[in-house]
């Protein structure tokens, strides 16, 4: 039997909730992975926002008479694969840069997920879910914008690991 529009929006919300809780766990790992107070502060801010996302999604599910699924969603599977691919950090400098890249990618994945939720919920006339999705999409866009310049900054910190060693890069 095919899903009703409400069942589908509930499934999308459950997937979004699973993604937000998975993102929270990933960001907690990024915080634990670094000793850099500036990165810890940025990731802590992202984590607070992500936890608030999960709470708002859960509240919307409850308003629809449903509960979070507790399962792992599509986004969690993608982030697990991204982590596997980028697990080769050789030192603290690489680890910081890679974790910033992963957090940036995560923000964009969530942004796309919320755009899909917005489009679908708008099409079925669920204005409350659409408004929530649009808000969350904007918050993830802002998070990505905060993270992007840090990629450049922290990629360059790897120079500190080779500074003074007499090794010069020549192209």
PLM regions with names:
Residues 1-171:
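Amphipathic alpha-helical hairpins
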């Amino acid at each position: 039997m095919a899903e009703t529009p409400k069942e589908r929006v509930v499934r999308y919300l459950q997937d979004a909730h699973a993604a937000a809780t998975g993102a929270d766990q990933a960001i907690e790992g990024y915080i634990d992975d670094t000793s850099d107070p500036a990165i810890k502060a940025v990731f802590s801010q992202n984590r607070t926002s992500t936890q608030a996302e999960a709470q708002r999604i859960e509240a919307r599910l409850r308003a629809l008479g449903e509960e979070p699924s507790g399962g792992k969603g599509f986004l969690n599977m993608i982030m697990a694969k991204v982590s596997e691919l980028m697990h080769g950090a050789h030192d603290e400098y690489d680890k910081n840069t890679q974790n910033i890249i992963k957090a940036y990618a995560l923000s964009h994945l969530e942004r796309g997920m919320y755009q899909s939720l917005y489009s679908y919920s708008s099409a079925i006339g669920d204005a409350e879910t659409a408004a929530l999705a649009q808000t969350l999409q904007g918050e993830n866009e802002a998070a990505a914008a905060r993270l992007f310049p840090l990629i450049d900054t922290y990629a360059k910190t790897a120079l500190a690991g080779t500074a003074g060693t007499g090794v010069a890069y020549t192209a």
